[in-house]
Amino acid sequence: MAGASGYTGALAAQIVWDHPDLELAAATSRSDAGKRLDRLYPRYRVPIGLSVLDLDRLDGIDAAIVAYPHGAAAPTVAALRERGILVVDLSADFRLRDPDTYARWYGEHGAPELFGTGVYGLTELYRDQLREATLVATPGCYPTASVLALAPLAEQGLLSEVFIAAMQGTSGYGRSSDDTVHFSAMTENAFPYKTEGHRHRPEIEQELAALGSPAPVTFVPHLLPLDQGELSTCFATLGEPTSKEAIRSLYAKRYGDEPFVHVLDGPPNLRAVRDTNECHVYVTVEERGRVVAFAAIDNIWKGASSQGVQNLNLMLGLDETAGLL
């Protein structure tokens, strides 16, 4: 587990530690080496010391989860792949397929020779490819919720235009010193941010287009006064009139056999998905005919760490739900 001292890395380490079929061989940190993980995160109860990642001491390692910041992950991912190690990357370094789009939003890529080689890790959409993958790009939290909310419509080529208002807790900022997420700034408060453009928008557009609906997306994220949880509200204009009953039937059929995506009879809430790998979806049609689709997830679970383990299970030929129920 590379980068185990951040929120998503620490949680991934805890899930692997408790996993019935995996052994956590090492947990590394660039900033907290020498400290114990169970001292940094007592509630995860992972009694292991954090060390510096030594790429020359990886004998017997089958897989790695990398939880470094965007831009910093790619060189480490490349080094691990050179050694034949399966990699689940939690950063954005391998999510986008177009190099110009990546450069616009993230800058120069740290491993251009690997760009475009990762399988996008939205498990419910790419399950077959993930079973054969050697490098998985775990989706961003906002794209996870938003694309799952819209996928049944996108797969039918129904989306014409999409507006998304998404809200999440402060853990989405990571272990940030930004005073925006200090308790005194966030308590009894909520606000939009990056209103003129967020880097998850092109990721959402990429995946909707790949499913069959190259629709323009307007995306505005909001910050909520809670630590974990994310709610995505998606307003979709369809290319042709479709009844509410037909749309709900489409969602029920698409997700009926999914172990972690549940289609609800009413709007979802964040408390129900906290500390789970679940995504709760609800879809309806408002009076003017526009579809409104909702998805609730825990942003550091299904939006990052547990989805990474869900994909790792598939890569290793394990039960997809192992360690996650």
Regions found by a protein language model. Give the residues of each.
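Conserved active-site and cofactor/substrate-binding residues in soluble primary-metabolism enzymes
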Residues: Y7, T117, C141-L148, T195-E203, ...
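C-terminal substrate-binding/catalytic lobe of Rossmann-fold NAD(P)-dependent dehydrogenases
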Residues: E196-V263
